[in-house]
């Protein structure tokens, strides 16, 4: 998931440099959502690993 978040962040950067504001904003939003989900899943995985 971190890889996909980085890919969407790069797409947002390239789109913003080329002047595509809508695509850049949408890609940034996807990158942020994926990053938050990945961090939450990583934290849950670290916490639950000791309990299994």
Swiss-Prot record:
Keywords: Cell membrane, Membrane, Transmembrane, Transmembrane helix. It is found in: Cell membrane. The keyword Transport does not apply. Disulfide bonds: none annotated. It is a multi-pass membrane protein. One of its GO terms (cellular component) is plasma membrane. The keyword DNA-binding does not apply. The chain crosses the membrane at residues 6-26, 30-50. Its main location: membrane. It comes from the Bacteria. InterPro entries: DUF1328 (IPR009760). Pfam families: DUF1328. Belongs to the UPF0391 family. This is UPF0391 membrane protein ACIAD3602. It comes from Acinetobacter baylyi (strain ATCC 33305 / BD413 / ADP1). The lineage of its organism: Bacteria, Pseudomonadati, Pseudomonadota, Gammaproteobacteria, Moraxellales.
């Amino acid at each position: 998931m971190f890889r996909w978040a980085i890919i969407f962040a790069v797409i947002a950067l390239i789109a913003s440099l080329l002047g595509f504001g809508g695509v850049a904003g949408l890609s940034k939003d996807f990158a942020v959502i994926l990053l938050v989900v990945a961090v939450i899943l990583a934290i849950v995985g670290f916490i639950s690993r000791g309990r299994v």
